[in-house]
Design a protein with these regions (language model features):
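The beta1-alpha1 cofactor-binding region of Rossmann-like NAD(H)/NADP(H)-dependent oxidoreductases
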Residues: 56-68, 100
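Active-site helix of classical SDR
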Residues: 118, 154
Length: 246
């Protein structure tokens, strides 16, 4: 994948993995647009990197996804890469009652938004040079963590969708890339919950190197192990991981 001279939209780009990728694309010579729900986080990102273009957008809402698409192709007609990175993770006890709206929001952000945005942008991307859709899934796509059941299920769904999307677009110029993180030391799910994870810069540097080499499925650490495991190995990983984090 050519890393310079692109125009890239990254959802959830004001923090975590999205922000780390945005920094690296910018340093490589690409134009970067980041969007997110929180205006304060976007301001902080722009203070650090004034070259960033920012847009407040809650991708959980269908109308805001459409508005994002219309704004992006109007303001940045050369946009050629969409990175579906935005995600939330919640611990959920399925035996307890909860507000269904919270589950619905997690599904919308983690699965519906990347599917919808991919379909919105596809006709535009097909007319650009070096177009790509990059979906950020998870090692939990392959082995669910039982205390984050909705997150795990949405990432499994997004992995499946990414495979189908890549197949359907195989005769078009649009490249479909999947980034599969392990636990990374970000604030996903809450501040301090992933301090045991891989350092963010270590993961982002690895991803960027693999993008440069042209890889289309980029997994790291425990996520790489899970993505290549046999069914018997997956069962063992599931048992061990869920005993550790119960």
């Amino acid at each position: 994948m050519e890393l310079s001279s692109n125009t890239i939209l990254i959802t959830g780009g004001a923090s975590g993995i999205g922000y780390a990728l945005a920094e690296r694309f910018l340093a490589a010579g690409s134009e970067v647009i980041i969007c997110g729900r929180r205006a304060d986080k976007l301001r902080e990102a722009k203070e650090q990197h004034p070259q960033f273009h920012t847009r407040v957008c809650n991708v959980a809402k269908e109308n805001e996804r459409i508005e994002l698409f219309e704004w992006a192709i109007s303001e940045f007609p050369n946009l050629n890469i969409l990175v579906n990175n935005a995600g939330i993770q919640r611990r959920v006890n399925l035996t307890e009652n909860e507000n269904w709206a919270e589950t619905e929001k997690e599904i919308e952000i983690n699965f519906c938004a990347p599917v919808h945005l991919s379909r919105l942008f596809m006709p535009h991307l097909a007319q650009r040079e070096k177009p790509a859709i990059i979906n950020v899934t998870s090692g939990l796509s392959f082995v669910p963590l039982a205390n984050v059941p909705v997150y795990s299920a949405t990432k499994a769904a997004l992995h499946s969708f990414t495979l189908s999307l890549r197949y359907q677009l195989s005769e078009t110029p649009i490249e479909v890339i999947e980034i599969i993180p392990p636990a990374v030391d970000t604030d996903l799910g809450g501040v301090g919950l992933h301090t045991f994870g891989v350092p963010l810069d270590e993961f982002a540097d690895y991803v960027f190197a693999r993008l440069q080499q042209g890889e289309i499925e980029i997994a790291y650490g425990t996520a790489l192990k899970s993505s290549q495991a046999s069914r018997a190995e997956l069962d063992e990983i599931f048992k061990s991981m869920n005993q550790q984090f119960r």
